[in-house]
């Protein structure tokens, strides 16, 4: 996230990092990167050591599912998938700790700082990585279920039926969503029908967002970061975001995805984003840079040509 989170006690966060991971850490510097979680660089004597993440619990994860995703990533890394950049296990024996201790709203995790990392110069590196990931022996991980709730259209109608006046961008977001409501409802009907055809026996290990924004080049190789989204799911969960691809990509990946599954996850992404952004912008907000990004994200999803 771009905004420094005022609800995160950075003194408590530093104490948690020192207690659970590295007692030599003496400073945290907020990093305005990514979207959806909060990040800090942890340093000791001026040298960067760790990338600290604080995840908000409640919408995509509860404490148990987040821990399952991270601990599953650690297990997969230990089993040979060393291209996963995974959290460091805390002294508690878990990958996450609550902030503050005993709470259920925020979870802290720590990964090694990649000081030499850069983004790939060209897309496509994920093909071979996903072939290995999807072919891996499954470990305990969260299991896919429709991200978009069955109450989605009713909830949206209820939300649109009242003013969004708890923040400066609310009414603009409500007008935008209202103008696209019928198409969103059609998308959901198609999505729900496709979701009913999914067979859990065909699930594989998936990353969730393996595109170039979650790839880093370090030590001469590409690694996948942001493993909180790991899940057992249809392989197309990872492929819809990079589709379409060329023959060379498919040759490196090793198989051809199902068009109906690609469509399912294309719709799931858009509807899930619409759900999250409308919840966000119909509630209390200040017009911060993150709020502006959320409004832009909502507009981009609603204006997609999905048929």
Residue spans of the language-model regions?
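ATP/Mg2+ or Mg2+-diphosphate-binding catalytic cores
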Residues: 2, 165-166, 275-307
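Protein kinase catalytic-loop region centered on the HRD/HxD motif
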Residues: 197-204
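Active-site Asp-x-Gly
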Residues: 204-205, 216-264
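ATP-binding pocket architecture of kinase catalytic cores
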Residues: 43-145
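ATP-binding glycine-rich phosphate-binding loop
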Residues: 23-43
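Catalytic-loop signature of eukaryotic-like protein kinases
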Residues: 209, 213-215
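Juxta-kinase regulatory segment immediately upstream of eukaryotic protein kinase catalytic domains
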Residues: 1-28
């Amino acid at each position: 996230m771009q905004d420094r989170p005022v609800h995160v006690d950075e003194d408590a966060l530093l104490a948690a990092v020192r207690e659970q991971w590295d007692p030599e850490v003496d400073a945290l510097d907020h990093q305005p990167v990514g979207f959806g979680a909060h990040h800090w660089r942890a340093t000791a004597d001026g040298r960067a050591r760790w990338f600290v993440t604080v995840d908000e619990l409640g919408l995509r994860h509860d404490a148990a599912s987040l821990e399952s995703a991270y601990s599953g990533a650690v297990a997969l890394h230990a089993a040979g998938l060393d291209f996963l950049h995974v959290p460091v296990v805390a002294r508690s024996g878990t990958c996450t700790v609550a902030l503050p201790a005993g709470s259920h709203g925020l979870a802290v995790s720590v990964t090694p700082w990649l000081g030499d990392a850069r983004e790939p110069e060209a897309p496509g590196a994920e093909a071979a990585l996903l072939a290995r990931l999807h072919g891996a022996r499954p470990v305990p991980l969260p299991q896919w279920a429709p991200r978009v709730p069955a109450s989605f259209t009713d909830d949206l109608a209820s939300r649109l039926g009242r003013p969004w006046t708890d923040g400066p961008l609310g009414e603009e977001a409500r007008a935008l969503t209202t103008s696209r409501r019928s198409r969103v409802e059609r998308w959901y009907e198609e999505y729900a029908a496709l979701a009913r055809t999914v067979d859990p026996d065909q699930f594989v290990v998936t990353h969730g967002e393996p595109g170039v924004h979650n790839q880093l080049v370090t030590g001469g190789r590409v690694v996948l970061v942001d493993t909180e989204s790991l899940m057992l799911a249809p392989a197309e969960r990872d492929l819809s975001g990079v589709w379409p691809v060329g023959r060379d990509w498919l040759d490196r990946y090793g198989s051809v995805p199902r068009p109906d599954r690609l469509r399912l996850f294309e719709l799931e992404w858009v509807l899930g984003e619409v759900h999250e952004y409308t919840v966000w912008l119909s509630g209390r907000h200040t017009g911060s840079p993150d709020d502006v990004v959320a409004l832009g994200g909502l507009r981009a999803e609603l204006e997609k040509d999905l048929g």
